[in-house]
Amino acid sequence: MEMDDSYIYVCGTSAESKKEIQVEELNILSYDTPAKPELVSRFHIIGQHVGESFAEGNRTNPNGSDQMITCHEIQKDNDRLYIAYRDEGVVILDITDPTKPVRVDGGYDYSPPFNGDPGLPREGCCPGAHTFMPAHHAGPLPSIAVLTDEHFNCPPGFGRIIDITYPRHMTLLSTYHITGVDDQYDFDKKKFVCPEGSQESAHMAEFDHRVKNGNLFYQAWYNQGLRAIEITNPFRPREVGYYISPDFGINVPGQKGRHTREPYPDWDSDLIYVTDGNGGGLTVLRYTGVLPTRPPIPGVR
């Protein structure tokens, strides 16, 4: 969900939605009268409504499972919405007039060739794109965005850096992963090997808006904690800090290990509030700078 002084932007179903699958769409509500919010417009992907058919590329994954085409995470930047739309990939909408949202991107849909989650269909989580976060920018529109997956199969979801200078022709610049999770490939068995007993995936990202050129962001990574990623060179993302919380061992049903989910930076206090979805509550952090390349040696200059 996102909101401004007059409107709320939220994913949800409608009377026209297909009932047998998860098909949330964008709903824009005016709350000029807070006691009586009013739906002013909607946006959906063709195929989400009863009587419609999905485009061929939005039907099945390479493993034969059904894709999930559903609105999930919304980011507002001036007069545009940047939406992670699960197996549809990403959507950019111009909301200069919120009652008439207009799609202005040419699509960036990577399922197929990737599965949203190779483990689906099953109970649990999750297909495809989770967060589509534009970087801080000096001009009227952003040129770089972070796109994260969310799925727990092996290999798990990871992150992408996207050039969105020309939204109708978005370009993948690089990907980023977590050492020890995404890089463990068994060449003899021809498959990835992932940690047991935990859920390993990227989740929500949030840029550090104190960095004026938008080159530092905080990436929640479930069992791998909070990671600070620097993209001064967007072709080569670099991890420059991390915080891995204790394993609280509470084990909410359906969850495994740490569940570092969302970072919420407060730029006035210079603090980052981080949530844990497996009973770990709220952790308050402060980013103090880049990790040293090696421990300092006393007395050496």
PLM features: what roles do these ranges have?
Residues 1-301:
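Feature marking well-ordered beta-strand scaffolds used for ligand recognition
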